[in-house]
UniProtKB/Swiss-Prot annotation:
This is Protoheme IX farnesyltransferase. Its EC number is 2.5.1.141. The chain crosses the membrane at residues 16-36, 41-61, 93-113, 114-134, 141-161, 172-192, 217-237, 238-258, 273-293. InterPro entries: Protohaem_IX_farnesylTrfase (IPR006369), UbiA_prenyltransferase (IPR000537), UbiA_prenylTrfase_CS (IPR030470), UbiA_sf (IPR044878). One of its GO terms (cellular component) is plasma membrane. It is an enzyme of class 2 (transferase). GO terms for biological process: heme O biosynthetic process. Carbon 2 of the heme B porphyrin ring is defined according to the Fischer nomenclature. The gene is cyoE. It comes from Xylella fastidiosa (strain Temecula1 / ATCC 700964). HAMAP family: CyoE_CtaB.
Length: 301
C-alpha cells in the first residue's frame, strides 16, 4: 500500500510542485496590504489547496503524455508509468480526480477568476506545451513558460479576485520574473542532458543550435532577469531589504551565466541549473520577508 501511494505521489512531481505552490503562496501574502481578514485566510488556504491539486494533476498528465519520451531519457526512465508500476488508465483517472477536486474547491469556495486562470494554466502546460511546443520548436520553453509562470498570479487572485488594475499589474510583475527565469533554468539542464533530448527527438535549444549559442542565450535572459527582478522595487511593491537581496542573487546568477560561456562546461551547466532553483526560492522568500518587514514597521510606527 505504501509503495503504491509513493508511486502516485511521484506522478505529481512533488519537488517541482513544491516550488510552484511556494510562489503562489508568496503571491497571496503580497496581495494583502495589511493583516489578512478571516475571509482572506480561508480563501488563501483553499486557494493554496486548489492550486496544488491542479499543479499535481498537470504533472501527472505530463507524465502520461510523455511516457514514451521519458522511457528514452536517463533522467526520467525511473518514473512509475515508464517502469509499469501504474497503468495509463490509472494515471488518467488520478489526474481527473485531482482536476475535479481542484476546480470544485476554486469555483465554489475561492472565486471564479482563480479557477479559470488555474485551469487555463493547467491546459497550457499539460497539453499545449507537452503535446505541441515541446516537440515542435526549440523555443518551447520560452513560449510555454507562461503557463508555468502563472502561480503567483493564481495566489494573488485567490485572495483578491484581481479586482483592481493594481492587482493585475503587481501580480503580472511576479509572473514576469518566473517567465524570464524559466529559459536559463531549463536550458542549463538541457545542456547537461542534451544527448538524452537528442535521443528522444526533442528539439531543445542545445540540440538544435548547439551549446555555445544556448550559453549566450542563457546569459541574455539572465541579464533581462536581473532587470525584471528590480521592477517590484520600482513600482513600490517591495523595498530596500528585497532590493539588496535581489542584487546579490542576480550578481551570482550573472556570474554563473558568464562562467558558462567559456569554455562550455556540462558539469557547470548542472551547477547553474541547481543555483537557478535556489535563486527563485530565495528571491520569492525575500519578497515575502520584505513585505512582512514593511508591515511590521507600519504597525510599530
Amino acid at each position: 500500500m505504501a509503495a503504491r501511494l509513493r508511486d502516485y505521489w511521484d506522478l505529481t512531481k512533488p519537488k517541482v510542485v513544491a516550488l510552484i505552490v511556494f510562489t503562489a503562496l508568496v503571491g497571496m501574502f503580497l496581495a494583502i496590504p495589511g493583516m489578512p481578514s478571516v475571509v482572506q485566510i480561508q480563501s488563501g488556504a483553499l486557494g493554496f489547496l486548489g492550486i496544488w491539486l491542479a499543479a499535481a494533476a498537470a504533472a501527472a498528465i505530463n507524465q502520461l503524455l510523455d511516457a514514451k519520451i521519458d522511457a528514452q531519457m536517463a533522467r526520467t526512465s525511473w518514473r512509475p508509468l515508464v517502469v509499469g508500476k501504474v497503468r495509463p488508465v490509472q494515471v488518467l483517472v488520478f489526474a481527473g480526480v485531482l482536476i475535479t477536486l481542484s476546480m470544485t474547491i476554486l469555483t465554489l469556495w475561492v472565486n471564479l477568476i482563480t479557477a479559470v486562470l488555474t485551469f487555463t494554466s493547467l491546459i497550457g502546460y499539460a497539453v499545449i506545451y507537452t503535446v505541441y511546443l515541446k516537440r515542435m520548436t526549440s523555443q518551447n520553453i520560452v513560449i510555454g513558460g507562461l503557463a508555468g509562470a502563472m502561480p503567483p498570479m493564481l495566489g494573488w487572485a485567490a485572495v483578491t479576485g484581481l479586482s483592481t488594475a493594481a492587482d493585475w499589474i503587481n501580480a503580472s510583475l511576479l509572473v514576469a520574473i518566473i517567465f524570464v527565469w524559466t529559459p536559463p533554468h531549463f536550458w542549463a539542464l538541457a545542456i547537461f542532458r542534451r544527448a538524452d533530448y537528442a535521443k528522444a527527438s526533442i528539439p531543445m535549444l542545445p540540440v538544435t543550435h548547439g551549446v555555445q549559442h544556448t550559453s549566450r542565450q542563457i546569459l541574455l535572459y539572465t541579464v533581462i532577469l536581473s532587470v525584471v527582478t528590480l521592477l517590484p522595487v520600482a513600482t513600490g511593491m517591495s523595498g530596500v531589504f528585497y532590493l539588496g537581496a535581489a542584487l546579490v542573487l542576480d550578481a551570482v546568477f550573472l556570474w554563473y551565466a558568464w562562467r558558462l560561456l567559456d569554455p562550455p562546461d556540462e558539469l557547470f551547466a548542472m551547477k547553474t541549473f541547481g543555483y537557478s532553483i535556489v535563486y527563485l526560492m530565495a528571491l520569492f522568500a525575500f519578497l515575502m520577508f520584505d513585505h512582512w518587514l514593511r508591515l511590521a514597521d507600519f504597525y510599530w510606527n
